[in-house]
UniProtKB/Swiss-Prot annotation:
Pathway: Carbohydrate degradation; 2-deoxy-D-ribose 1-phosphate degradation; D-glyceraldehyde 3-phosphate and acetaldehyde from 2-deoxy-alpha-D-ribose 1-phosphate: step 2/2
Alphabetical list of SMART domains matching this protein: DeoC
Protein name, as recorded: Deoxyribose-phosphate aldolase
Gene that encodes the chain: deoC
EC number: 4.1.2.4
General function of this protein: Catalyzes a reversible aldol reaction between acetaldehyde and D-glyceraldehyde 3-phosphate to generate 2-deoxy-D-ribose 5-phosphate.
One GO cellular component term: cytoplasm
Record carries keyword Lipid metabolism: no
Catalytic activity: 2-deoxy-D-ribose 5-phosphate = D-glyceraldehyde 3-phosphate + acetaldehyde
Length: 217
């Protein structure tokens, strides 16, 4: 298993400087990670730095709360792609979902997917704020949307992905939707277990330590 190609090497801290982003990019090139996941303000810079590599540029939309107007999220997506983003990780409107406004949530995801075109869309549902039943329901919604991935977490709530989150998503989605586990993956065994349970992508800020841990196994 080439775990490096499952990794979205992530730095979304608001205080991240260009020096921090360059370090992230250099690490991603060295380890040949799937992507760097960064704030929209750094897309152009990352795209230029990664021009001669296979590492993709992933960014976030409606992040981290998800409560922007749909039109704002769509416009954010348009600008992100124009600046060179290869993959989009959007946050659903969590309050609307918990209010059982399922059609609103579905239509918003569809609108952003339409703007993405052939670019990969991952839908962040913030499992820390959902019951197990809600995780199953939101997985069903994402399956109907045309998005490629469902993603567990922003990394900005009180916890990241749990093994149970991924188990529920996999049970509902089976092979009809890819799963990104993000946040809370701290050691190599966490990464291994997430993949065994069905995760197809791992969003991690501790990617280097985890890769070093995996190399020892």
């Amino acid at each position: 298993m080439k775990y490096n190609k499952l990794v979205d090497h992530t730095l979304l801290a608001p205080q991240a400087t260009v020096h921090d982003i360059d370090k992230l990019i250099d690490e991603a090139i060295k380890y040949d990670f799937k992507s760097v996941c960064i704030a929209p303000t750094w897309i152009k810079h990352a795209k230029e730095k990664l021009a001669k590599s296979d590492v993709l540029v992933c960014t976030v939309i409606g992040f981290p709360l998800g409560s922007n107007a749909t039109s704002v999220k769509v416009y954010e997506t348009k600008i992100a792609i124009a600046h060179g983003a290869d993959e989009i990780d959007m946050v659903i409107n969590i309050g609307r979902f918990k209010n059982k406004e399922y059609e609103f949530v579905l239509n918003e995801i569809k609108a952003i997917k339409e703007e993405c075109g052939s670019k990969t869309l991952k839908v962040i549902v913030e499992t820390a704020l959902l019951t197990n039943e809600e995780i199953a329901k939101v997985t069903e919604i994402v399956m109907q949307s045309g998005a490629e991935f469902i993603k567990t977490s922003t990394g900005f709530s009180y916890r990241g992905a749990s093994f149970e989150d991924v188990e529920i998503m996999k049970r509902v989605a089976q092979d009809k939707l890819l799963i990104k586990a993000s946040g809370g993956i701290k050691v190599g065994d966490d990464a291994i277990k997430m993949v065994e349970l069905g995760a197809n992508r791992l969003g991690m800020s501790k990617s280097i330590q985890i890769m070093e841990d995996l190399e020892k196994k």
